[in-house]
Amino acid sequence: IMPEVISVDDDVAILRLSYRVGAANDYSSSDTYTVSEYYRIRQTNSGFYLLNFEREMNQVFDARNDLTSTAKINLGINSSTDVNCASDEKGIYTYFVNQGSLWCFSSSSQTFTRVFSFKGEETDSVREGYDAHNIKIMKIEDNGDATFLVSGYMNRGEHEGQVGVSLCRYSYSDNDVTERLFIPMAIPYNILTQNVGGVSYVSNDKFYILIDETLYSVDLVSKEVMTEITGLKENSYAVSDAGDAIAYSVSGDICNTDTIRVLNMSNDSAYELKADEADTLRPLGYIDSDFIYGMAHKEDICLL
């Protein structure tokens, strides 16, 4: 059991206990589950009082008996219905993330492959199972190869004990993962999830990533780092659904900008939208690859 203090405020504390359990299934074997229990406790002169209790339970995918007769992947019990998954254009290779591990399912061979995981096959998983990282599926090619991003605490491997961002490429034919870039970060995981990687994209040998309101590009061959955009404040920019384009206020002002610049990261091209002299523009979002923006007369804007 791994205890963790989530927060402490005066006489109230929130604690989390994380552990694993096993349970028999219908196939004469057992399944493994990760359990997180949250306790909200108050301390008084007379003792401790439990104010609230919550429990989450998630099944650990192991690729055994997890493919149904209708070719659906059975992920079992999960506390969320959201699944981090993506497929190639032909729908042959499906990548998905489960409990900190990246898996690939090939519909042509009807096989599962564990692409990336900190967990070992024959360990107690205490060190490897520390859950403080995210996996983002970046790109899947028609031959099954994939590019993905691991951000957070590195449980094992070359960067064990460090917090950072690792850009990796997986070769399906060779069943091999190659790290193309590692960016160490001197911040804890909970801060990293808020300030790093909100925008990330790979185009050929160029990698884009947003860190602390600045969009950087990295040449994956020469490792040269370039600053593309600065001052990307919340609500001052929008990213396309595919993640390959970003539209942002050139001035960085949410309610007073006369120019919006749209950067297409897939081909490194850009164009600008200009407002009339007495008007202002604001990026609102994307519908697929179509950029949506708002326009208003400056004299009609009243800031409270």
What are these regions (language model features)?
Residues 2-29, 134-142:
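Surface-exposed, charged secondary-structure patches
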Residues 5-13, 43-46, 285-289:
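A short, structured loop/turn motif at beta-sheet edges
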Residues 12-17, 24-29, 34, 43-47, ...:
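Non-catalytic localization/regulatory regions flanking kinase domains
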Residues 13, 83-105, 136-169, 196-211, ...:
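Short beta-strand elements that form the blades of beta-propeller/WD-repeat-like
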Residues 32-38, 257, 279:
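Short, surface-exposed coil-to-beta transition loops
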Residues 40-45, 153:
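Active-site-adjacent structural elements in enzyme catalytic domains
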Residues 48-76, 101-128, 159-190, 210-230, ...:
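Surface-exposed loop/turn elements that mediate protein-protein interactions on large endomembrane-trafficking
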Residues 79-86, 124-141, 186-200, 231-242, ...:
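Repeated scaffold domains used in trafficking and secretory/extracellular systems
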